[in-house]
């Protein structure tokens, strides 16, 4: 598991996360909900290993324990960590005119054979990149300059990149559960692509036994696709569990400061949240 235990994160004089404990389980999708500024991205970055060690931003203090498969996250070097977890950040706009293929192949660099100072991308890696593009519904974009893509098209390409990074590979040097961290993966997508992406996330979590943490702004979308929902408010988890148990008017009011009512759909899926 990927676990935070009694986690505190502060930036200068501001406490962002306080005494927070949360585990991301292999084979399951955890959706993280919370209002703007609640600390969701900070928690995801902590799980990603971006706030500790030499990469920690100036003025950020992290206390508590974060472990990946039982090993302290801070002790895992960057090459190993890149084989064990992939991160899709909010803003992933390339500054240079790479092709779609090149962006997705970046996901294979942690696994590539080294020849001196160079990484050698094998035919197997190119095949995995192509299959990842297909799985992400972005194969029609192959060959395009990424600077010409729409926001939604680029989001699907970047999703393919993280799929390629974690794609099951019998020649992989690292074994054990792996983890996918997604920061608002559906923000740039239309309605159909939002559901397709999260359907794919849930499918690969099952098939590859990935532990997934996804920040999602639409509680209804999260409830439909996640196995577990964690609600963040005032720097800590205020509700955690199955969508049907967590998605209540009281929890939504505590998390968002907004009154809602729940409407049953009658099809066995969690109730839908609407304004009260």
Curated annotation (Swiss-Prot):
The complex is composed of two ATP-binding proteins (HmuV), two transmembrane proteins (HmuU) and a solute-binding protein (HmuT). CDD domains: ABC_Iron-Siderophores_B12_Hemin. Part of the ABC transporter complex HmuTUV involved in hemin import. Responsible for energy coupling to the transport system. GO terms for cellular component: plasma membrane. InterPro entries: AAA+_ATPase, ABC_transporter-like_ATP-bd, ABC_transporter-like_CS, P-loop_NTPase. ATP binds at residues 34-41. Residues 2-259 form the ABC transporter domain. Keywords: ATP-binding, Cell inner membrane, Cell membrane, Membrane, Nucleotide-binding, Translocase, Transport. It is found in: Cell inner membrane. It comes from Burkholderia cenocepacia (strain HI2424). It is a peripheral membrane protein. It comes from the Bacteria. This is Hemin import ATP-binding protein HmuV. Belongs to the ABC transporter superfamily. Heme (hemin) importer (TC 3.A.1.14.5) family. NCBIfam families: PRK13547.1 (NF010067), PRK13548.1 (NF010068). SMART domains: AAA. Its EC number is 7.6.2.-. Pfam families: ABC_tran. It is an enzyme of class 7 (translocase). Signal peptide: none annotated. Gene3D superfamilies: P-loop containing nucleotide triphosphate hydrolases.
């Amino acid at each position: 598991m990927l676990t935070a235990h009694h986690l505190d994160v502060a930036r200068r004089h501001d406490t962002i996360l306080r005494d927070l404990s949360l585990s991301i389980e292999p084979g399951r999708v955890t959706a993280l909900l919370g209002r703007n500024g609640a600390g969701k991205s900070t928690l995801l970055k902590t799980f990603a290993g971006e706030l500790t060690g030499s990469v920690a931003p100036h003025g950020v203090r992290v206390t508590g324990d974060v472990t990946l498969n039982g090993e302290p996250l801070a002790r895992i070097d960057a090459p190993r960590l890149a084989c064990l977890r992939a991160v899709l950040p909010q803003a992933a706009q390339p500054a240079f005119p790479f092709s779609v293929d090149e962006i997705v192949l970046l996901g294979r660099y942690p696994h590539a054979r080294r020849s001196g100072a160079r990484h050698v991308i094998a035919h197997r890696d190119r095949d995995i990149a192509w299959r990842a593009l297909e799985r992400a519904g972005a194969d029609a974009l192959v060959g395009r300059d990424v600077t010409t893509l729409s926001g939604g098209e680029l989001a699907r390409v970047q999703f393919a990149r993280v799929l390629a990074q974690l794609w099951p590979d019998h020649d992989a040097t690292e074994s054990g559960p792996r983890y996918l961290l997604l920061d608002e993966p559906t923000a740039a997508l239309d309605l159909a692509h939002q559901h397709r992406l999260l359907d794919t996330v849930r499918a690969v979590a099952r098939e590859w036994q990935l532990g997934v943490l996804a920040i999602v702004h639409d509680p209804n979308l999260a409830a439909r696709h996640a196995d577990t929902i964690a609600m963040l408010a005032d720097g800590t988890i205020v509700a955690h569990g199955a969508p049907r148990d967590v998605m209540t008017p009281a929890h939504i009011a505590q998390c968002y400061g907004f009154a809602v009512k729940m409407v049953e759909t009658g099809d066995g899926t969690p109730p839908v949240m609407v304004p009260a």
